[in-house]
């Protein structure tokens, strides 16, 4: 076989149909778009229209709402914090808060605050100031001899959690 003998299989490449090029082509005049109207125009489609049938987005019930008071936290686990301490990115002797974690690159941005979660093991004695922390995370920090200061306002017993 020579390089000049290489060719595509028969029928593997089909030429595109040039529409709107006279009635003899079979795709002249309306170019396969039917008659006049909205769907014959370019760039126009009726989004969600199902031919008169009730569209799916109207058949399904509305549900839920967006809470405008919702807080979005940057979450950090104990193992990630320990990795940063081992890599000397975070000083274990200093107070660890959101600004320190962002500066060290442990969290990208503080968002509405940092929440400490309990995955992993902590070996260092730390003083941590975070907006919130899970019970296992607090227990692990205190077991290692450290303290956790929660910056979030404390909810009363009467308030819903």
Swiss-Prot record:
InterPro entries referenced in this protein's UniProt entry, alphabetically: Ribosomal_uL15 (IPR030878), Ribosomal_uL15/eL18 (IPR021131), Ribosomal_uL15/eL18_sf (IPR036227), Ribosomal_uL15_bac-type (IPR005749), Ribosomal_uL15_CS (IPR001196)
GO MF entries: rRNA binding; structural constituent of ribosome
Biological-process GO terms, alphabetical: translation
Known role: Binds to the 23S rRNA.
Pfam families the UniProt entry points to: Ribosomal_L27A
Subunit structure and binding partners: Part of the 50S ribosomal subunit.
Keyword Ribonucleoprotein: yes
GO cellular component: cytosolic large ribosomal subunit
Positions of the UniProt region annotated as Disordered: 1-44
UniProt keyword Transferase present: no
Keywords: Ribonucleoprotein, Ribosomal protein, RNA-binding, rRNA-binding
Family of the protein in this entry: Belongs to the universal ribosomal protein uL15 family.
Compositional bias annotation for Gly residues: 21-37
Organism: Rhodopseudomonas palustris (strain BisA53)
Official protein name in the record: Large ribosomal subunit protein uL15
